[in-house]
Amino acid sequence: MMDLPTIISWVGTVIGIILNLSPAVLFYNIHLGKEKYTNIPETMLIFNILCSSLWACYWYLQEDKFVPFFSAMAGLGLSEIFSLLYLYYFSGKCLKKYLLFALLEINLVIEFNYVLIRIIGDYSMVGNIAVVVNILTYIAPGQNIIKVCKEKNYRLIPIASTLSGASCALSWLLFGILIKDIHTIIPNSLGLIFAAINSFTWAYFYCNRDKNDDEENGQKELITPEKEEI
């Protein structure tokens, strides 16, 4: 029978995998031509790859930490897949250029993990680096909150992703508390705080929104231009 930390870590793993699948919608829209390529999602994916690599090595260097290791590896695998898909569009769908970029990225990921495990080899040191990099990933959400406050537009906050992220952070925070792992507690505490700030900001501007603007936007979405007969 599984103990409580293991159950909670599996919950966090499932939520984390769902969150890591979220770029699929963006890539589908890019494939259909509904959205254009930008560097921002690729930058976020690179940060995710870096973070996942660090956490995977952190848990690998410890004993009996299969579930968090599996969670980190799942995040690394999904982020790598989406990143490689993004490189395909970045290379202008040129196969030779794409293969060059793809092999370079995969090689860098392998070498980075090799350095963490074989050269550093100390899980505490790897954990310290992981915490710092994890904290840096909150810069983008922080800038988005500032933008929301300036424009007073609650739609800029993806509330579904925010709540899912909060659930994931809460799961791993509880896991970290139960196993008394400070490297897990710090980033997930900050993640939960950022998610709470995002949620309160969204709720505030949603409750104080201009309902007339909402009605106009809704009407614009319903109105579709008629096709001209040829």
Language-model region placement:
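Alpha-helical membrane-protein topology signature
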Residues: 1-230
